[in-house]
Amino acid sequence: MASITAEEIEFATDLFSDLGDLTTRRMMGGLCLYHQGTIFAMVHSDYGVMIKGEGAFKEELDAMGLWHWTYTREKTGTSSSMPYWKLPDSALDDPQEACDLARRALAHL
């Protein structure tokens, strides 16, 4: 896994800038994005920009057909999932759509 680039960080912070009170922190092989101290999205070098899903919002993300981050543990072979779904391509090109999804995510966190 490669590190995320300065360009990827700038892209993500610009994409969600309309939320205001946005902070970031490097972790989990990427960059976590926070609004008013609550993590709502992350940027992963391998998977791109992902939105956090909790509660009923998880079902909405699945219904949208978005890719859900899962992984297999090498040692045990068991699969696990993280509470993150890849943003749709349309949201990557539309900050309003991205921020709408972020607000929906935050409402369930």
Predicted regions and their residues:
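Charge-dense, helix-prone N-terminal extensions
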Residues: 1-109
